[in-house]
């Protein structure tokens, strides 16, 4: 199969997250398209716990990492807001679960390191309207988040 269009990759990631939530007895409901802050509302079956989840998906033919809007670096101060980074692979998918502000700090840290490093010719880098986050920047803490759905607090 050829390269999937970005919108198909994104929607597929949202459905994959909903499916994983369902396997854990958590109801995942997609929000209307273009909701700016989150894609899924997840709730326990008894309705006692609910969280909002933004989903970012990277397909298996992507070798640059997750492309995020620069607004990801704006903290939301909401303990019930999460981001799931989906690494969509041919057979098995990986899900990296973050509280929103934790990912916000990580992405800001990675971007600040990037922007403070001059280009090969010595000139400074210019600010861009997106942020990349990929495996080469992962710490041991990032790897502990793989398929760690307990971070959402439903356990």
Q: PLM features: residue spans?
A:
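Mixed-charge (Asp/Glu-Lys/Arg
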Residues: 1-36, 41-155
């Amino acid at each position: 199969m050829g390269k999937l269009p970005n919108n198909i990759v994104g929607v597929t990631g949202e459905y994959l997250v909903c499916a994983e939530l369902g396997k854990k007895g958590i109801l995942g409901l997609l929000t209307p398209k273009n909701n700016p802050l989150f894609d899924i509302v997840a709730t326990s079956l008894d309705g006692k716990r609910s969280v909002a989840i933004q989903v970012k998906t990277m397909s298996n033919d992507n070798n640059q990492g997750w492309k995020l809007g620069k607004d990801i670096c704006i903290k939301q101060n909401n303990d019930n807001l999460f981001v799931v980074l989906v690494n969509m692979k041919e057979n098995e998918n990986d899900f990296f679960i973050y509280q929103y502000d934790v990912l916000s700090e990580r992405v800001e840290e990675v971007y600040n390191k990037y922007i403070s490093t001059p280009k090969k010719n010595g000139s400074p880098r210019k600010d861009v309207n997106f942020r990349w986050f990929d495996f080469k920047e992962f710490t041991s803490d990032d790897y502990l988040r793989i398929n760690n759905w307990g971070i959402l607090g439903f356990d």
